[in-house]
């Protein structure tokens, strides 16, 4: 579902691990249905959840029936809070909202019809609705359309624990402020690889924590 604007011419330790594994997005069947009658639309997950201090990826994709102009001038923008809310990111300027300075990355390549918005160092105040908007030049003029329901981001507090795991596995995506990946391979494949790597790292944490707990219990057994 999308709105079109057309302009002619233009344990404590284990609990923490499980909480991290719960971060992600829910693609509900009725979240963003294709509207083939109109032939254009934007697809986003219905809900995403993350942990304070962590990061979250909001995937998006879009489709359209028009023939692109020689210079399509394709760009992606994101709004938050409501459909007519403030713009937090615009790839054509580039622009990034003060609230998200140094914390937003758009993994999208010019000409591609899918990508990912990554929010780093999540804050409680980031909890809101997020809407992606597409802008391009077609042979029929400038076309602009946006997701209507958007994606609801829920941010949960990290668990405060006194017990620390002796094993720490970190997965970090380094960036300096705003990054617009205009010279990369297919971002969907790159994001899939990153998600698989992060999942394997989290599974490794669980295995190591369980192993450490079993080792401690074995050490504490009375000698016969």
Curated annotation (Swiss-Prot):
Gene3D superfamilies attached to this UniProt entry: Immunoglobulins
Cytoplasmic membrane side: 217-224
Keyword annotations of the record: Glycoprotein, Membrane, Signal, Transmembrane, Transmembrane helix
Glycosylation sites: 90, 107, 154
Molecular function GO terms recorded: MHC class I protein binding
Leader sequence residues: 1-28
Residues in the Extracellular compartment per record: 29-195
Top-rank taxon, per record: Eukaryota
GO biological process: myeloid dendritic cell activation; negative regulation of osteoclast differentiation
Bilayer topology term: Single-pass type I membrane protein
Subunit structure, interactors included: Interacts with CD99. Probably associates with DAP12.
Free-text function comment from the UniProt entry: Paired receptors consist of highly related activating and inhibitory receptors and are widely involved in the regulation of the immune system. PILRB is thought to act as a cellular signaling activating receptor that associates with ITAM-bearing adapter molecules on the cell surface. Seems to associate with DAP12 and is a receptor for CD99. May be involved in target cell recognition by natural killer cells and in activation of dendritic cells.
Protein name: Paired immunoglobulin-like type 2 receptor beta
Gene: Pilrb
């Amino acid at each position: 579902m999308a709105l079109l604007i057309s302009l002619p011419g233009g344990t404590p330790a284990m609990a923490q691990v499980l909480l991290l594994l719960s971060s992600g997005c829910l693609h509900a069947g009725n979240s963003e249905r294709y509207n083939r009658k109109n032939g254009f639309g934007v697809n986003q997950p219905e809900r995403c959840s993350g942990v304070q201090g962590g990061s979250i990826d909001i995937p998006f994709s879009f489709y359209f029936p028009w023939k692109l102009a020689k210079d399509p001038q394709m760009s992606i923008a994101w709004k938050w809070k409501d459909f007519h809310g403030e713009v937090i990111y615009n790839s054509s300027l580039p622009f990034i909202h003060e609230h998200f300075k140094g914390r937003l990355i758009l993994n999208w390549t010019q000409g591609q019809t899918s990508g990912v918005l990554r929010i780093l160092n999540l804050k409680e105040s980031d909890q809101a609705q997020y809407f992606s908007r597409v802008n391009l030049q077609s042979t029929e003029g400038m076309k602009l359309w946006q997701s209507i329901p958007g994606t609801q981001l829920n941010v949960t507090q990290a668990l405060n624990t006194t017990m620390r795991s002796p094993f720490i596995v970190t997965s970090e995506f380094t960036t300096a402020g705003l990054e617009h990946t205009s010279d990369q391979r297919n971002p969907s494949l790159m994001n899939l690889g990153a998600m698989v790597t992060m999942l394997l790292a989290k599974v490794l944490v669980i295995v190591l924590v369980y192993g450490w707990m079993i080792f401690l219990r074995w050490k504490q057994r009375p000698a016969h």
